[in-house]
Each structure stands twice: as C-alpha cells, then as structure tokens.
C-alpha cells in the first residue's frame, strides 16, 4: 500500500466536517430505535464496540428528543476524568456551543457547567456526591452510566443507588452503556421486565493479530523492541502500547528517547507520550495532539486507553498482556498492586484500538496458549478494596443495615467488618453503627480519606488548621518530589534535602508546599528544585475546596501555629491516623499496634534513622514485606488516650 494512500487515510476523519463525521458513526442508524427503547423502558442497555459513538451521540440524541427540556438535565458518567472532560469538549464542538454552556463537565476539583447546561459529563464519583444533596436525582431526567463494564467501586455503588431511585421515580430513565458488559446479569439485577437491550453493529477495519511463538522473558523490553521494529519496518501510523503501570511507561519513554539519537534518517521521528492516571487531565490530553507526517506518535498507556477514548491515527497496538490489580488485605489493612494477566475481554478491547481508521495490526506479547488461559472478565473492584468509603457513603444516605443495600455483587463480609471496626475506632461510627454527630456526619460529606478528614475536622482544637489544610491537600494530590532516573539524580537529592524535616515526611512535604507558595508558585523554581509542579498546583486547588468544606461547618481556617514547634501538627494527625502507629524492633523493622511487622519505605527521610515511634499514612504490601509511607516521628506518651479506648 503506497505511503501517500496511508497518510491520506489517517487524516480522513480529522478533515471531514463534523456533521459528516457524526453520520458516519455506526450508532447513527440506531437513533430512532434507541429513542423508542428509552421511551418505553426504564432501563436501556446499549452494547457497542469502542468508537461506535455511544459516549458522544447518545446524550445528543436524547437532548434533541426533548429529554432535557422540562423535567431535568441529561447526565453521563465516566470512570475517568480524562474522558469526562475530553468528551464534553468534543460534544460542545459538535453542538456548536461554547464549552460549559449547553454541554459541560464536572470532575474532582474541575468544573465547567452553567445554568444553561443540559448535558453534563462527570465522573461516577461526582454523581455519587450529588446524591447526598439530591437523593432522588431530581435534577436529572435521565442518567447514562457509561463504561459500566469497568466495575469500579463507584460504578457498583451507582448501580445499587440507581436501582432504588428507579423504584421511586417512574419518570426517571437509565441507560447502561458498555463495550463488553454481561447484559444478562444486568437485566436480572434490575428486573428483566424493565430492561431493553440493544446492540450497535458497526464494522471495524480488519485487524491482523500477531502472537509470540514462545513466551517473552521481559515484556517491557519486548514492547520497546516491537515499537522500534514497527517504526523501521511498517508504513506510517501511530502506535499504542499497553503496559501495566507508570514505572514501566516511564522506563519505555526514556528508552525510546535514547533510541532516537541513533535512529535512521529513513524512519519517522517517534514522539513518545505517557497516558496513565498519575498525570493531570491536561497532561493526558497531549495524546490527542496531531503531528505532521515526519513524526509518529507512540503512546505508552495503562488500560485507560482500552475503552472510552478514541485516539485518531492509531494503526498499531502492542499489547503486553498484563495489568495492575489492587488486592486489599482486611487483616493487615494493607493493599498491594500486582501484575496479573488481562482478561480476554480486555485483550479484545485492546486489539480493537488498531482498527478505528484503517487496517491495523496488534502485536500480542504473549502466546495463543496464554490467551486461551485468560479469564473471560476482570474482577470487580468491590471484591478487592477497602470498604470504608462504601460504608461511609451508605451510612451517609441513612442506611442502618448495609447488607440491605442492593449490591450488584456483594462485597466480602470480612472487608465490611474491617471497615466498620476502623470507622468505630476513628470515632466516625457509634456502638450501634450509626454516624456520630457531628464528626461522623461531617466526614461522610467529605471527599477525603476518613483518616485525613478527621485530622482536618479536629485541627481547630490543636490550633493548626492552616497547616493541616495544606497537609491534607498534599496527601491527596500525591508525591511532591520529582525523582529523575538520569545522571541528575544526585542533584535532585541535594535539592530535596534542603526541605527535609527531622519530624519526617509529612512536615517535609509541608515545607515544600509553603516554599512553593512563598516563591510565587513558580514553575522554574520547581524545576530547579526537582519538584512536581503539577502536583503542587493541584494541591493548591484541593486546598481551596477544603477551605470551602470547612466553611460549611463554620470551622475557622486561618488558625496557624505561632512557632516552628510541629508537635501540635503531629498530634492532630495522630488523631486521624491513630491505628497507623508502630515502634522500632531490634532488626530495624517496626511492629504496628496490631502486631504486624512493617518496614519504612526507602524514600522516607526517616529511613535508617531508627526513630523509636512512628506514624504513617498508608501501607503497601510487597511479595514478602509490608512497607509504610508518609512517615512521621511521634512520642509514645501521645498514644495513652488512644490505647485506653482500644482496650
């Protein structure tokens, strides 16, 4: 196939007028069938491959049919922030309306909606929060739960909540949209007499699937070799590489950047781009940038690119065959991320990314036998995570007996019991399992982790609300230090050490944040000191939201300590992280109050300091050990009142 023809094919969709693009989408010919199904049934399940137009067109069909004219607006949930924002902007373009006007979006810490908004894209967590203030979702005439197959904790919660709302609102409609969900299970859950299922048929371009003849010893290095081989051998077309996590992505990008130095002049110049949840939405949006013919995008992504988003120009997919799965241990209160083989459903979704605009190829870095042994579907998050957020949410809705909630899949009892115990010891639940007043009620209204929320809500008693606001924001935003893997690693350590505090990691992070604000939030200052500018900017945004949160309960937010004594800050944090304490053992490890052996994370400023007593914010389990993070030095006598309560 001539290169000129391929280049033209790649740009066809981009250069086609919007109205023609919409007509070319497979879902367009199902418009009337969809509207009739929604009119006649409370619940409509729409099955269709990624890219058929479900996410962008269904809300527009409903808007044009009058579903947002009188009784409420149209809501569309997404599991991921990137999708909610990017799709909203795309639909605004198609409607010839300014973003945030007729169509808007709402994601955590970022909202672009107005009184004129009739179509609202949002993360599933945002809709859950709205239920606190609008229990029957009376603002909405219809809600579309998109990508329901991803089975996040929020999605599963929404399924149960929406089932209850449907029982009380005959005028309410629900659309469940997915590329690969089991429609029969959903129909049985909601009641088959209420459900209509329709499939969107649409022909993808042919995709050639290539398997390995024998297993690879290192799929990450194999992915890099495959990318370089594609660039030197195959015609133009962008490349999408599926990996399991951030470290693998960063490793591959560095290797590709290094390879560009020795690349042949006959090849296109590769433009390596990351795509994972650790990036800001603006950073994620870079994958949609269009480059001229001398350049070839290679996107290294987690499963975020499996569904929901369609990146024009992808012709080649490299599938590692692995994904990260979080496993929660209710006995140790720790979680670990492990590499697991993907499901067959995910493998099919990944290969489909190559056939969007022209013929494609998928390079599966595993054998046909490995594929045959894969599970059909991935496990739901509700089976493998801490249940504290779920319990808080349901208690906030006034549910006395959690087991009466209509779970699509019931969480393990041991996970629920662990969450109930933790929330009781934190003072969020009373002995009857009800929210305490005011603390429990306030925490149930917070988007923060319950431990951080308690520290924040009690900070005025310690006179350090100003500092705890900043700390809560940093802990929520993520890692403030940028740790390069290059020759500048030592320079970064020297820069970071100027912020180190004897009290530990959290006061160190507070030093960074306050210095960032004191240096006028300057990007160049962050680069000079090897700090994550985007994380610090996000922490500022989170802090603004937290100030508003405290204002709702008339809690003063300007209180700050008059001196450099950090003990009150640490005592306040201990009020929230009372279970997360440990004392030093002879072998250098630590023993928690629950008797578990843990080790300090190597990145901690207290690593190898042999601090007698510590407090930590989180624990991560490896194959053989438990590591604690965000560590602070505490005094043993601070624990007296808490130990008395536990006994």
From Swiss-Prot:
It is an enzyme of class 3 (hydrolase). The lineage of its organism: Eukaryota, Fungi, Dikarya, Ascomycota, Taphrinomycotina. Residues 219-398 form the Helicase C-terminal domain. One of its GO terms (molecular function) is RNA binding. It is found in: Nucleus. It holds the Pfam family OB_NTP_bind. One of its GO terms (cellular component) is nucleus. PROSITE patterns: DEAH_ATP_HELICASE, HELICASE_ATP_BIND_1, HELICASE_CTER. GO terms for biological process: mRNA cis splicing, via spliceosome; mRNA splicing, via spliceosome. Residues 35-199 form the Helicase ATP-binding domain. ATP binds at residues 48-55. The keyword Amino-acid biosynthesis does not apply. InterPro entries: DEAD-box_helicase_OB_fold, DEAD/DEAH_box_helicase_dom, DNA/RNA_helicase_DEAH_CS, HA2_WH, Helicase-assoc_dom, Helicase_ATP-bd, Helicase_C-like, P-loop_NTPase. Pre-mRNA processing factor involved in disassembly of spliceosomes after the release of mature mRNA. A motif (DEAH box) lies at residues 146-149. Its EC number is 3.6.4.13. This is Putative pre-mRNA-splicing factor ATP-dependent RNA helicase C20H4.09.
């Amino acid at each position: 196939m001539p290169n000129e023809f391929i280049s033209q094919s790649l740009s066809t969709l981009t250069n086609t007028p919007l109205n023609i693009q919409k007509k070319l989408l497979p879902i367009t010919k199902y418009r009337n069938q969809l509207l009739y199904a929604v009119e006649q049934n409370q619940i409509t399940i729409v099955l269709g491959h990624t890219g058929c137009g479900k996410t962008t067109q269904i809300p527009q069909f409903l808007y044009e049919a009058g579903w947002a004219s009188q009784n409420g607006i149209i809501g569309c949930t997404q599991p991921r922030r990137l999708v909610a924002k990017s799709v909203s902007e795309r639909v605004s373009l198609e409607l010839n309306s300014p973003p945030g006007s007729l169509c808007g979006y709402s994601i955590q810490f970022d909202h672009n909606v107005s009184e004129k908004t009739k179509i609202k894209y949002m993360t599933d967590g945002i809709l859950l929060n709205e239920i606190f203030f609008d229990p029957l979702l009376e603002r909405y005439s219809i809600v579309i739960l998109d990508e329901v197959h991803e089975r996040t904790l929020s999605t599963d919660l929404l399924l149960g909540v929406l089932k209850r709302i449907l029982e009380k609102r005959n005028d309410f409609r629900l659309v469940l949209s997915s590329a690969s969900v089991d429609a029969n299970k959903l129909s049985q859950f909601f009641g088959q007499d209420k459900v209509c299922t329709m499939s969107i048929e649409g022909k993808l371009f042919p995709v050639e699937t290539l398997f390995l003849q024998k297993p690879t010893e290192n799929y990450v290095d194999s992915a890099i070799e495959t990318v370089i081989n594609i660039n030197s051998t195959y015609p133009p077309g962008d490349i999408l590489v599926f990996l399991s996590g951030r470290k693998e992505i960063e490793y591959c990008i560095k290797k590709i950047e290094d390879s560009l130095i020795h690349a042949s002049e006959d090849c296109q110049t590769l433009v390596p781009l990351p795509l994972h949840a650790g990036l800001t939405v603006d950073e994620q949006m870079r994958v949609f940038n269009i480059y001229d013919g001398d350049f070839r995008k290679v996107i290294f992504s987690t499963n975020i690119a499996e569904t929901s988003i369609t990146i024009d120009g992808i012709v080649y997919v490299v599938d590692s065959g692995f994904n990260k799965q979080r496993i929660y241990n209710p006995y140790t209160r720790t979680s670990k991320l492990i590499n697991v083989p993907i499901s067959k459903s995910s493998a099919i979704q990944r290969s489909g990314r190559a056939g969007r605009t022209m013929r494609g190829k998928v390079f599966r870095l595993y054998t046909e036998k490995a594929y045959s042994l894969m599970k059909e579907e991935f496990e739901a998050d509700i089976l493998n995570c801490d249940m504290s957020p779920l319990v808080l949410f349901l208690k906030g809705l006034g549910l006395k007996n959690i087991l009466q909630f209509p779970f699509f899949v019931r969480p393990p009892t041991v996970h629920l019991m662990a969450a109930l115990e933790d929330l009781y010891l934190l003072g969020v639940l009373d002995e009857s399992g009800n929210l305490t007043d005011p603390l429990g009620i306030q925490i149930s209204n917070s988007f923060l982790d319950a431990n951080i929320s308690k520290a924040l809500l009690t900070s005025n008693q310690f006179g350090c609300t100003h500092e705890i606001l900043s700390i809560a924001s940093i802990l929520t935003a993520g890692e403030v230090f940028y740790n390069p893997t290059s020759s500048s690693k030592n320079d970064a350590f020297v820069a970071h050490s100027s912020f180190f505090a004897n009290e530990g990691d959290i006061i160190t992070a507070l030093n960074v944040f306050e210095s960032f604000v004191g240096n006028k939030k300057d990007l160049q200052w962050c680069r000079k000191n090897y700090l994550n500018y985007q994380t610090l900017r996000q922490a500022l945004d989170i802090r603004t939201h937290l100030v508003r949160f405290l204002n709702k309960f008339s809690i003063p937010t300007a209180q700050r300590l008059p001196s450099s004594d950090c003990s009150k800050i640490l005592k306040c944090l201990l009020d929230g992280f009372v279970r997360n304490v440990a004392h030093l053992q002879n072998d250098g490890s630590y023993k928690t109050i629950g008797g578990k052996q843990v080790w300090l994370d190597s990145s901690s400023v207290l690593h190898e300091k042999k601090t007698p007593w510590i407090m930590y914010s989180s624990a991560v389990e490896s194959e053989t050990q438990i590591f604690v993070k965000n560590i602070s030095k505490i005094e043993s006598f601070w624990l007296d009142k808490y130990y008395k309560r536990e006994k």
